[in-house]
C-alpha cells in the first residue's frame, strides 16, 4: 500500500546522495508567489478522496528486517513479498558493508546485525558478497555482544542467543497497582506496549524453529562459545543494583519460585487483547505489534486465530510495496500529516471553506477520541478528547497531534461550526488536565518521569519514560496563542487557566540552553526545539520573555549555513542539523547539508522572534527564503533525504516525507504575510 503519489519520490536512489539535497531551480528560482502557488497545488494533488493527507514515514531497515523474522517465526513467509524485501535490504546496504540508522551515519551495528539475519533467513548464503562485507562490519564493531537488547531478543527467539543474557521481567509486575512505583504505567506507552508482551515471552523463553535453520555463530566476535551470558554492566551503581536484582529473579526462575506466575501471564494476555484495535494494531507502532504477535505465538495462538490474522493485516498496512521493493514503516501518520498540511494551506491563502479543507476538517473531527485510554491511570479526572497520530489508536491520543489538530480546525470554516467548536473545547479540557507537575507537557502521559527506569538492564535505549519536553510544551502554548490571536469565540474557561500558562512559560525558560537554543525531542534537534519555543513565547508572552527570545534568535542566525558564519559545511543560506547532535551537543545546529524542513523551522523561529522584538533578522531570513525558492522543484515540492524526525534520540530516527512540503509552505506564507503588512522589508538583491 502506497501513501500518496510515490512516483515523484522514486528517483533511483537520489535519496542516498547528499549532493542532490536541495537540488532545484537554482539558476531560475520561482518568485515567492509562484513558489507558494506551486506548493499549494502539489499538496492539493496529494489529498485522498476521504479528505486526509498521508505520506510515507521512513525509518531504517530494522522494521523490514523484523518483519522478515516474524513471518519466518510464524511460518507464513509466503504471505509477504519476501523477494521484494530482499531487494530493499540489499539496496539499503552501504559500501562499507553496514546498514545505517539514518543516511550518512557510517553504519550501525544492531541495524546491520538484524539486516544480516533477515537476509540469511531469506536464503542468502553467507558466501554472498553483500553478507561477507556485512559480517566484516559486524565483527569490526564487536559483534552480537555489543548490540542492543532488542537485537539479542530477536536472536534468542531463533535460538541464536542465550536467554540468560536477556533481563528478567517477572509476570507479577502485571499485578502491581497503577500508583505503584514500578507499575507498568510508570513506563512510557511505547515501552509499556513492549514490556507487557515481553513479560510472557521472557517467562516462556521460546525458541522457534525456522527454515532455513541457521546458527549465526559467525556474528560473535569472540566466538559463541566464549560469549558472555550475563547482562552487561554500565558502570554506575544503579546498573550494579538492577543486575543484582536480575540475578535474584533468574535464581527464582531456576528454582521454580515465581510468585503469581500464571496470574500475571493471564493479566498480560488480557491487557493486550483489550488494547488491540479492530484494525489489528497494538498501540499503532511497530515494536509493540511485533512483540504482541510473538507473545500470542508463545501462548499457543494459531496463525489462523482472528487475533493474529487482524494483527498480520495491520503489518501489511504498514508496508510500502513498489514494483520491485517492499519496506515496512514504523507507524502511519495521517492525522499528523493532515493537520499540518491544513495549517500550511490556510496560512498560504487558501480560503478556510475551500472544499478540500472542509473534507479534511470533517475527517479530522471523525478521528477525535472520546474514550479514556491508558493516560487516565495517572489523570483520572481528565475528560477524553484528544487525537492520535494514526488512523486508529483509541488508547493513545497524544498532546502534539491534539494541539496541532486544534489549531488546524480553528482556522477552518466547516458546515457545522458548533460541532467543530465542541470538539475543540473538549480537547482543550483534556490538554489542560495533562500538564505535568514541572509545568510542561509530555507526549502521551502525565507525570511519567521516573528516570530511574532507564537504568534497568532492559532499557539500553534509555527511552522507558515519557517526560515533559520543550517541543510539545511549546506546541501547547502556541495553540493557546493561536486561538487567542484568531479571536476564537471560546469562554476564557475553555483555554488553559492563567496559572497553567505561567507554569508552562517557566518550564520553557528553564529548558533554554546556555547558547540560547532549546533541545528538540521529536524533531532534529535544537533547530526544531528552538523554533517551537520562539513561536510559543512570541505568541503568549513576548513582553516578559524578550531576553530569551533574542538569545534564541541569535543562536539561529549563528548556525545558519552562510559564508562568514561557518568555515566548513554548506554556505547556501539554509539550515541543517545532523542527528549526531543527539550524541554530541557540540554539533548543535550543525550539519553537512541544509534541508528544507530545518530551514523552514529556523525561518518560523526568526519570524516569530521578529514579531516579538519588533526587529527582524532581515538578511538571515532573506537568505533562508532564497534557499527555499532556489531548491523548489518544478512540481512544487522539495526533496529531502535527511532524517529530521525524532523517534528515540541516538537510537531511531524518522524521515517524514511531507516535512519538506508543509513546513516549507507555512514558512514562505508567514514571510509573505509580513512582507505584505510591511513588517519586514525584502532583502536587497
UniProtKB/Swiss-Prot annotation:
Pfam families according to UniProt: SQHop_cyclase_C, SQHop_cyclase_N
Reactions listed under catalytic activity: squalene = dammara-20,24-diene
GO MF: intramolecular transferase activity
Keywords: Isomerase, Repeat
GO BP, one annotated term: triterpenoid biosynthetic process
Superkingdom, natural source: Eukaryota
InterPro entries in UniProt: Hopene-cyclase, SQ_cyclase_C, SQ_cyclase_N, Squalene_cyclase, Terpenoid_cyclase/PrenylTrfase
Keyword Repeat: yes
EC number: 5.4.99.37
GO terms for cellular component: lipid droplet
Active-site positions on this chain: 400
PFTB repeat windows: 82-123, 265-308, 424-465, 621-672
Protein task: Squalene cyclase producing the tetracyclic triterpene dammaradiene.
UniProt record similarity statement: Belongs to the terpene cyclase/mutase family.
NCBIfam families, A to Z: hopene_cyclase, squalene_cyclas
Protein name: Dammaradiene synthase
Lineage: Eukaryota, Viridiplantae, Streptophyta, Embryophyta, Tracheophyta
